[in-house]
C-alpha cells in the first residue's frame, strides 16, 4: 500500500519536518528517546552476545554493550530521522564505534579491535543477504525472462548494498585505529600475561 514501515511510533520523517508539523516537542523528543534507547538496548544485548563468543573478559562486557548501543542507535537515528542513506549511516556508526573502542580500550586495557568487532556485528545487514539469496533462488527457478531480469536486478542491488555496508563498517572502525596508532596499540602495553 505504499507505506514505509521502518518506524512504528514516530513518523519516519526528518526531524525538521517533525518539528514543523505542530506536534508537541516533548512528545516528539520522548518518543525519539524511547526509540533510540530501545534500539541501543537490543544492540547492546547482541554486542555482549558477540563479545562472549569472541572471548572478551567479563569486565569488558559493559563497555562492549555501551559501544554497540551508541553505534547502532546513531545509525538508526541517521537513517530514520536525518534522512541519511544506510551506507553513509553505517560509515558514521563505524567511525563512532572505532573511536569509542580506541579511547575506552585504554581505560580497560583491551585492544580496540576486541571491543569494536563485537560492537559492529549487530549492524551486519542480514536482511540484504536474505533478499540476495531469495532473489537468486527466484532467478534460478523462473522460466519467464522478465521475472528473471527483475529478480536478478533485486539480487544485484541487495548484494551490492550489503557488501558496501559491511565494507563501510570496517573502514569506519579501522580509521580511528590508524589515526591514533600510539593510543590504539599502546592500550595493552605493560600487561602481564597469565
Give short role names for the model-derived ranges.
Residues 29-42, 84-95:
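Structural signature of hydrophobic alpha-helical transmembrane segments
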Residues 132-194:
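C-terminal membrane-adjacent module
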Residues 59-69, 87-93, 113-122:
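Cytoplasmic-side transmembrane-helix entry/capping segments in multi-pass membrane proteins
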Residues 45-56, 99-111, 177-182:
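C-terminal ends of transmembrane helices
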Residues 75-80, 94-110, 116-122, 126-127:
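Short helix-perturbing small/polar motifs within transmembrane alpha-helices
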Residues 33-50, 67-74, 171:
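Hydrophobic, membrane-facing alpha-helical anchors
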Residues 25-31, 45-58, 73-84, 152-153:
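Short juxtamembrane and helix-loop transition motifs at transmembrane-helix boundaries
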Amino acid at each position: 500500500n505504499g507505506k514505509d514501515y521502518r518506524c512504528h511510533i514516530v513518523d519516519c520523517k526528518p526531524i525538521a519536518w517533525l518539528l514543523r508539523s505542530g506536534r508537541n516537542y516533548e512528545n516528539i523528543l520522548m518518543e525519539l528517546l524511547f526509540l533510540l534507547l530501545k534500539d541501543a538496548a537490543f544492540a547492546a544485548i547482541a554486542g555482549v552476545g558477540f563479545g562472549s563468543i569472541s572471548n572478551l573478559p567479563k569486565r569488558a562486557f559493559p563497555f562492549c554493550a555501551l559501544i554497540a548501543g551508541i553505534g547502532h542507535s546513531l545509525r538508526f537515528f541517521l537513517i530514520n530521522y536525518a534522512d541519511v542513506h544506510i551506507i553513509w549511516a553505517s560509515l558514521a556508526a563505524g567511525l563512532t564505534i572505532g573511536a569509542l573502542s580506541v579511547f575506552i580500550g585504554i581505560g580497560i586495557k583491551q585492544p580496540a579491535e576486541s571491543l569494536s568487532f563485537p560492537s559492529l556485528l549487530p549492524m551486519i545487514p542480514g536482511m540484504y543477504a536474505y533478499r540476495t539469496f531469495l532473489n537468486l533462488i527466484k532467478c534460478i527457478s523462473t522460466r519467464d525472462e522478465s521475472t528473471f531480469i527483475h529478480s536478478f536486478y533485486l539480487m544485484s542491488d541487495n548484494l551490492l548494498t550489503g557488501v558496501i555496508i559491511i565494507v563501510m563498517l570496517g573502514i569506519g572502525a579501522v580509521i580511528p585505529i590508524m589515526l591514533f596508532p600510539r593510543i590504539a596499540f599502546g592500550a595493552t602495553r605493560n600487561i602481564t600475561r597469565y
